[in-house]
Amino acid sequence: MPVIKVRENEPFDVALRRFKRSCEKAGVLAEVRRREFYEKPTTERKRAKASAVKRHAKKLARENARRTRLY
């Protein structure tokens, strides 16, 4: 859980914004959304594999685009 220290004479809005930013960087909300419902291990593995395939395809597309531009 991200912790921030409220500075002297710091407005509440600014402290809240800093806290939200630190939560976003730590990935707290994404983790909560991911754990909201139970996901079977097979479904979790399937989703992770699909994500890896998509990431790999994206990487190949980037490399291919870079190769075609250099002529």
UniProtKB/Swiss-Prot annotation:
Residues 43-71 are annotated as: Disordered. It comes from the Bacteria. PANTHER family: MITOCHONDRIAL 28S RIBOSOMAL PROTEIN S21 (PTHR21109), SMALL RIBOSOMAL SUBUNIT PROTEIN BS21 (PTHR21109:SF22). The gene is rpsU. GO terms for molecular function: rRNA binding; structural constituent of ribosome. Gene3D superfamilies: Ribosomal protein S8. GO terms for biological process: cytoplasmic translation; ribosomal small subunit assembly. Residues 46-59 have a biased composition (Basic residues). This is Small ribosomal subunit protein bS21. Probbly involved in recognition of ribosome rescue factor SmrB in stalled/collided disomes; fusion of protein fragments to its N-terminus decreases ribosome rescue in the presence of SmrB. HAMAP family: Ribosomal_bS21. Belongs to the bacterial ribosomal protein bS21 family. It comes from Escherichia coli (strain K12). Part of the 30S ribosomal subunit. In stalled ribosomes contacts ribosome rescue factor SmrB. Keywords: Ribonucleoprotein, Ribosomal protein, RNA-binding, rRNA-binding. The keyword RNA-binding applies. InterPro entries: Ribosomal_bS21, Ribosomal_bS21_CS, Ribosomal_bS21_sf. GO terms for cellular component: cytoplasm; cytosol; cytosolic small ribosomal subunit. The keyword Cytoplasm does not apply. Residues 60-71 have a biased composition (Basic and acidic residues).
